């Protein structure tokens, strides 16, 4: 038998044996590996992850928080990121070259991030430059690919989060007359409106038709919104709010700004994931809340606050499907391959893309 025949190929899809393991055995193995590896292993877990995954997280938070925490951890060799692809990309860009970022399931993407690819964006920028010249600055939500962050970096722009969007949009208007906001039109619209920019000064760029959607004199345009959205938050409607108002008139309604403008306008409060968590945490016992955000997080908030009446704004809401791809079997698989000295599902961003994307990230980080 030759040496080549003895080498076993590294599996790239979840092996069948993980489907037959009991939850108890999987949890036991995860704990064993975590204890064995100690500080060499770091597991960040996004707020939208399942409880079966979050229970093993060394840190929980939103995408940028987790990337920053990972970057500040210089001891860990392996960062097993329990989130979606763009989050792991950001972690890879902010960590050192000798740290390895792993995504337990490479199918864990983000439909919103995928709504703006670099070819579409370069083409749009070229067309918009014909219309507006050098009067625009691009901002991208951190929920975007590394390539889009890099595009913003090399064009003088920056990244934003739902927590600091107002600060970053305000900064953008000190740089240029117009703003191009990618890839979530709703966060861009809600933020700009909150800063006093009228809706009739906002246009939408449709990447599928390569056209600007706007009725009126284009010289009046201040904000150009990319036609993208979050598939989860898009499902909250004004009708949901009307139903809550009718059946529970004393219930507070709080939503994420990835919801559409009409939903945000009709709600009592709107803010980032952290804002929602903090608001419920500080609310008095006995208060009532309908929350418009991802279902795994809503369920976790309900469990953490039994003294409050909390429901999802949309009773038929499902968890984020791509976030849900990261589960206990995939987490254990990733950890066991590391234990064997193998590396699967490694996230590695091109160096030039990293340099330009980090420009955009740093322009944000130095201002917030």
Curated annotation (Swiss-Prot):
Catalytic activity: iminosuccinate + dihydroxyacetone phosphate = quinolinate + phosphate + 2 H2O + H(+)
Ligand binding ([4Fe-4S] cluster): 110, 230, 320
Superkingdom of origin organism: Bacteria
GO molecular function: 4 iron, 4 sulfur cluster binding; metal ion binding; quinolinate synthetase A activity
Cofactor(s) listed: [4Fe-4S] cluster
GO cellular component, one term: cytosol
Annotated binding of iminosuccinate, by residue: 46, 63, 141-143, 162, 256-258, 273
Keywords of this entry: 4Fe-4S, Cytoplasm, Iron, Iron-sulfur, Metal-binding, Pyridine nucleotide biosynthesis, Transferase
Top EC category: transferase
Keyword Cytoplasm: yes
InterPro entries attached to this UniProt entry: NadA, NadA_sf, Quinolinate_synth_A_type3
Subcellular location: Cytoplasm
EC number per UniProt: 2.5.1.72
Function field: Catalyzes the condensation of iminoaspartate with dihydroxyacetone phosphate to form quinolinate.
Name of the protein this chain belongs to: Quinolinate synthase
Source organism (scientific name): Bacillus cereus (strain Q1)
Lineage of producing organism: Bacteria, Bacillati, Bacillota, Bacilli, Bacillales
């Amino acid at each position: 038998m030759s040496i080549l025949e003895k080498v076993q190929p590294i599996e790239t899809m979840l092996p069948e044996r993980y489907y037959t393991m009991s939850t108890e055995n999987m949890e036991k193995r995860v704990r064993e590996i975590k204890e064995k590896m100690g500080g060499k292993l770091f597991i960040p877990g996004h707020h939208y992850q399942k409880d079966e995954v979050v229970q093993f997280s060394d840190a929980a938070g939103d995408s940028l928080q987790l990337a920053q925490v990972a970057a500040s951890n210089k001891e860990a060799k392996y960062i097993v990121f329990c989130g979606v692809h763009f989050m792991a990309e950001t972690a890879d860009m902010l960590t050192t070259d000798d740290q390895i970022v792993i995504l337990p399931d490479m199918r864990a993407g983000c439909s919103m991030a995928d709504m703006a690819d670099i070819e579409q964006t370069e083409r749009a920028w070229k067309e918009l430059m014909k219309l507006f010249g050098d009067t625009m600055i691009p901002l991208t939500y951190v929920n975007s690919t590394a390539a889009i962050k890099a595009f913003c970096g090399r064009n003088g722009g920056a990244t934003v989060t739902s927590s600091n969007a107002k600060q970053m949009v305000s900064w953008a208007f000190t740089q240029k007359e117009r703003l191009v906001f990618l890839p979530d039109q709703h966060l861009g619209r809600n933020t700009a409106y909150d800063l006093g920019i009228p809706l009739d000064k906002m246009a939408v760029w449709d990447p599928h038709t390569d056209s600007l959607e706007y009725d009126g004199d284009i010289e009046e345009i201040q904000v150009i919104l990319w036609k993208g959205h979050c598939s989860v938050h898009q499902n909250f409607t004004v009708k949901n709010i009307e139903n809550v108002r009718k059946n529970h008139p004393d219930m507070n309604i709080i939503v994420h700004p990835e919801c559409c403008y009409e939903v945000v306008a009709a709600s009592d409060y709107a803010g980032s994931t952290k804002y929602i968590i903090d608001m419920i945490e500080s609310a008095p016992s006995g208060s009532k809340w309908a929350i418009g955000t991802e279902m795994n997080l809503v369920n976790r908030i309900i469990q953490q606050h039994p003294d409050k009446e909390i429901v999802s704004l949309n009773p038929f809401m499902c968890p984020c499907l791509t976030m849900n791809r990261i589960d206990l079997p995939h987490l254990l698989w990733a950890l066991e391959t590391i234990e064997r000295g193998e590396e699967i599902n490694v996230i590695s961003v091109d160096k030039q893309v990293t340099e330009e994307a980090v420009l955009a990230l740093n322009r944000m980080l130095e201002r917030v």
